[in-house]
Amino acid sequence: MKKFFLIAVVLLMMINFIINYHHEVTKEKHTPMADFKTKVEMAPMKEYNDPDFGYVVKYPCFFQQEDTSVSGCQGYARFSFTNHANIILESYVTPNYSNTLQACADSLAQKLHSERTIQASNKAFILSGPVYENGVRVDGYSHYDKFIKSGRILFVYSLTYPDSYKPAMPRLFKLIDDWKVLGAY
Protein backbone atom coordinates (compact mmCIF):
# COMPACT_ATOMS: atom_id res chain seq x y z
CA MET A 1 0.00 0.00 0.00
CA LYS A 2 2.87 2.37 0.81
CA LYS A 3 4.43 1.62 -2.58
CA PHE A 4 1.14 2.36 -4.33
CA PHE A 5 0.77 5.64 -2.42
CA LEU A 6 4.38 6.63 -3.19
CA ILE A 7 3.98 5.78 -6.88
CA ALA A 8 0.70 7.72 -7.02
CA VAL A 9 2.29 10.80 -5.42
CA VAL A 10 5.28 10.68 -7.78
CA LEU A 11 2.96 10.19 -10.76
CA LEU A 12 0.79 13.15 -9.70
CA MET A 13 3.89 15.31 -9.27
CA MET A 14 5.09 14.37 -12.76
CA ILE A 15 1.69 15.12 -14.29
CA ASN A 16 1.57 18.46 -12.46
CA PHE A 17 5.07 19.32 -13.72
CA ILE A 18 4.16 18.43 -17.32
CA ILE A 19 0.96 20.50 -17.19
CA ASN A 20 2.75 23.52 -15.70
CA TYR A 21 5.65 23.23 -18.16
CA HIS A 22 3.25 22.99 -21.11
CA HIS A 23 1.32 26.01 -19.81
CA GLU A 24 4.53 28.11 -19.53
CA VAL A 25 5.74 27.11 -23.01
CA THR A 26 2.33 27.85 -24.52
CA LYS A 27 2.14 31.18 -22.70
CA GLU A 28 5.53 32.22 -24.12
CA LYS A 29 4.43 31.46 -27.67
CA HIS A 30 1.28 33.56 -27.41
CA THR A 31 2.78 36.99 -26.92
CA PRO A 32 1.20 39.88 -28.84
CA MET A 33 4.31 40.05 -31.06
CA ALA A 34 4.19 36.32 -31.84
CA ASP A 35 0.48 36.55 -32.58
CA PHE A 36 1.11 39.52 -34.89
CA LYS A 37 3.91 37.65 -36.67
CA THR A 38 1.64 34.66 -37.31
CA LYS A 39 -1.17 36.92 -38.46
CA VAL A 40 1.01 38.97 -40.84
CA GLU A 41 2.63 35.86 -42.33
CA MET A 42 -0.76 34.29 -43.10
CA ALA A 43 -2.78 37.37 -44.07
CA PRO A 44 -4.03 37.91 -47.60
CA MET A 45 -3.00 41.26 -49.03
CA LYS A 46 -5.30 44.07 -50.06
CA GLU A 47 -4.36 46.60 -52.73
CA TYR A 48 -4.65 50.35 -52.59
CA ASN A 49 -4.70 52.17 -55.94
CA ASP A 50 -3.83 55.83 -55.59
CA PRO A 51 -6.32 57.88 -57.64
CA ASP A 52 -3.99 60.88 -58.04
CA PHE A 53 -0.67 59.30 -59.07
CA GLY A 54 -1.75 55.80 -60.10
CA TYR A 55 0.66 53.84 -57.94
CA VAL A 56 -0.42 50.64 -56.14
CA VAL A 57 0.61 49.41 -52.68
CA LYS A 58 -0.27 46.16 -50.97
CA TYR A 59 -0.99 45.86 -47.25
CA PRO A 60 -2.19 43.08 -44.90
CA CYS A 61 -5.97 42.72 -44.88
CA PHE A 62 -6.22 43.24 -41.11
CA PHE A 63 -4.61 46.69 -41.26
CA GLN A 64 -7.11 49.55 -41.20
CA GLN A 65 -7.04 52.07 -44.02
CA GLU A 66 -7.28 55.51 -42.44
CA ASP A 67 -9.16 58.47 -43.84
CA THR A 68 -6.44 60.74 -45.23
CA SER A 69 -8.75 63.14 -47.06
CA VAL A 70 -8.41 65.68 -44.24
CA SER A 71 -4.62 65.79 -44.70
CA GLY A 72 -4.99 67.76 -47.92
CA CYS A 73 -2.09 65.82 -49.44
CA GLN A 74 -2.45 64.21 -52.83
CA GLY A 75 -1.02 60.72 -53.22
CA TYR A 76 -1.10 59.95 -49.49
CA ALA A 77 -2.44 56.75 -47.92
CA ARG A 78 -2.06 55.33 -44.41
CA PHE A 79 -2.75 51.83 -43.07
CA SER A 80 -2.44 50.97 -39.40
CA PHE A 81 -2.46 48.13 -36.91
CA THR A 82 -3.00 49.40 -33.36
CA ASN A 83 -3.78 46.31 -31.31
CA HIS A 84 -1.01 45.99 -28.64
CA ALA A 85 1.39 47.95 -30.88
CA ASN A 86 1.32 50.85 -33.32
CA ILE A 87 2.45 49.65 -36.74
CA ILE A 88 1.98 52.05 -39.63
CA LEU A 89 2.32 51.60 -43.39
CA GLU A 90 2.22 54.86 -45.36
CA SER A 91 2.58 55.69 -49.01
CA TYR A 92 3.00 59.16 -50.41
CA VAL A 93 4.53 61.27 -53.14
CA THR A 94 6.98 64.08 -52.42
CA PRO A 95 9.10 66.45 -54.54
CA ASN A 96 12.66 65.41 -55.39
CA TYR A 97 15.06 68.36 -55.28
CA SER A 98 18.25 66.36 -55.91
CA ASN A 99 19.91 65.84 -59.27
CA THR A 100 21.19 62.33 -58.59
CA LEU A 101 19.80 59.32 -56.77
CA GLN A 102 22.81 59.22 -54.42
CA ALA A 103 22.44 62.90 -53.50
CA CYS A 104 18.76 62.30 -52.82
CA ALA A 105 19.51 59.24 -50.65
CA ASP A 106 22.24 61.07 -48.72
CA SER A 107 20.04 64.09 -48.08
CA LEU A 108 17.08 62.03 -46.88
CA ALA A 109 19.30 59.74 -44.79
CA GLN A 110 20.60 62.79 -42.94
CA LYS A 111 17.11 64.28 -42.53
CA LEU A 112 15.62 60.98 -41.27
CA HIS A 113 18.67 60.09 -39.11
CA SER A 114 18.88 56.80 -41.01
CA GLU A 115 21.59 54.36 -40.07
CA ARG A 116 21.97 52.74 -43.45
CA THR A 117 21.16 53.21 -47.10
CA ILE A 118 20.52 50.33 -49.46
CA GLN A 119 20.35 51.06 -53.16
CA ALA A 120 17.52 48.85 -54.39
CA SER A 121 18.08 49.71 -58.07
CA ASN A 122 19.30 52.57 -60.24
CA LYS A 123 16.01 54.41 -59.47
CA ALA A 124 15.27 53.34 -55.88
CA PHE A 125 16.82 53.14 -52.44
CA ILE A 126 15.85 52.04 -48.95
CA LEU A 127 16.47 53.92 -45.72
CA SER A 128 16.01 52.51 -42.25
CA GLY A 129 16.76 53.54 -38.72
CA PRO A 130 15.29 54.98 -35.56
CA VAL A 131 12.25 57.25 -35.75
CA TYR A 132 12.74 60.93 -34.93
CA GLU A 133 10.01 63.52 -34.45
CA ASN A 134 10.97 67.21 -34.37
CA GLY A 135 14.61 66.19 -33.94
CA VAL A 136 13.90 63.97 -30.92
CA ARG A 137 14.26 60.19 -30.99
CA VAL A 138 10.95 58.36 -30.53
CA ASP A 139 12.11 55.70 -28.09
CA GLY A 140 11.52 52.13 -29.20
CA TYR A 141 10.41 52.80 -32.81
CA SER A 142 12.13 52.36 -36.16
CA HIS A 143 11.30 53.01 -39.81
CA TYR A 144 11.93 51.16 -43.06
CA ASP A 145 11.25 53.23 -46.20
CA LYS A 146 11.59 52.69 -49.93
CA PHE A 147 12.00 55.71 -52.19
CA ILE A 148 11.47 55.42 -55.95
CA LYS A 149 12.72 58.34 -58.04
CA SER A 150 10.64 59.31 -61.05
CA GLY A 151 11.80 62.57 -62.56
CA ARG A 152 11.33 65.35 -60.02
CA ILE A 153 9.18 63.31 -57.63
CA LEU A 154 9.71 60.48 -55.18
CA PHE A 155 7.23 57.72 -54.51
CA VAL A 156 7.59 56.52 -50.91
CA TYR A 157 6.36 53.40 -49.12
CA SER A 158 7.13 53.54 -45.41
CA LEU A 159 6.84 51.19 -42.43
CA THR A 160 7.02 52.42 -38.81
CA TYR A 161 7.15 49.72 -36.15
CA PRO A 162 8.12 49.05 -32.53
CA ASP A 163 11.68 47.74 -32.22
CA SER A 164 10.37 44.85 -30.12
CA TYR A 165 8.30 43.71 -33.14
CA LYS A 166 11.26 43.56 -35.57
CA PRO A 167 11.23 39.71 -35.56
CA ALA A 168 7.67 39.91 -36.94
CA MET A 169 8.53 42.30 -39.79
CA PRO A 170 10.20 40.17 -42.53
CA ARG A 171 7.06 39.90 -44.68
CA LEU A 172 6.44 43.65 -44.45
CA PHE A 173 10.12 44.40 -45.22
CA LYS A 174 9.83 42.16 -48.30
CA LEU A 175 6.58 43.86 -49.30
CA ILE A 176 8.40 47.20 -49.31
CA ASP A 177 11.56 45.78 -50.94
CA ASP A 178 9.52 44.33 -53.82
CA TRP A 179 7.35 47.44 -54.35
CA LYS A 180 7.52 48.97 -57.81
CA VAL A 181 5.77 51.92 -59.41
CA LEU A 182 4.83 51.36 -63.03
CA GLY A 183 6.41 53.96 -65.27
CA ALA A 184 8.97 55.03 -62.67
CA TYR A 185 11.66 52.68 -63.97
What are these regions (language model features)?
Residues 1-2:
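N-terminal hydrophobic targeting signals that begin at the initiator methionine
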Residues 5-20:
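Hydrophobic membrane-insertion alpha-helices, especially the h-region
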Residues 17-29:
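Hydrophobic single-pass membrane-insertion segments
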Residues 30-73:
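N-terminal "mature-domain start" segment
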Residues 66-174, 185:
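Conserved polar/disulfide-associated segments of primarily extracytoplasmic proteins
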Residues 182:
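Terminal recognition/anchoring or ligand-binding modules at protein termini
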